Amino acid sequence: MNSKLTALIFLGLVAIASCGWINEEKIQKKIDEKIGNNILGGMAKAVVHKLAKGEFQCVANIDTMGNCETHCQKTSGEKGFCHGTKCKCGKPLSY
């Protein structure tokens, strides 16, 4: 039960960080307080960093909020495609 609650809190913090309500640094400090600076804490901080740095909200090749498409239409007039957590204009996935 305790591990499920920890996972739920972690996912909530990741969602808050990706929305920009609180910054990544504050969340990483909370991870250090709760989990510690060990392998599990390092993995959690890496996930938070990877998800929080995506400015177009691309997650697992899915444009969750349409920001990638909007960005590409404004800048180049091409269709936007998510490649993992990155947005690429006019370059569809080849697999």
From Swiss-Prot:
Disulfide bonds join C58-C82, C68-C87, C72-C89. GO terms for biological process: defense response to bacterium. The keyword Disulfide bond applies. It is found in: Secreted. Expressed by the venom gland. Has antibacterial activity against B.subtilis, K.pneumoniae and P.aeruginosa. One of its GO terms (molecular function) is toxin activity. Belongs to the long chain scorpion toxin family. Class 3 subfamily. This is Heteroscorpine-1. InterPro entries: Long_scorpion_toxin_alpha/beta. Pfam families: Scorpion_toxin_alpha-beta (PF14866). GO terms for cellular component: extracellular region. It comes from the Eukaryota. It comes from Heterometrus laoticus (Thai giant scorpion). Residues 1-19 form the signal peptide. Contains 3 disulfide bonds. The keyword Plastid does not apply. Keywords: Antibiotic, Antimicrobial, Disulfide bond, Secreted, Signal, Toxin.
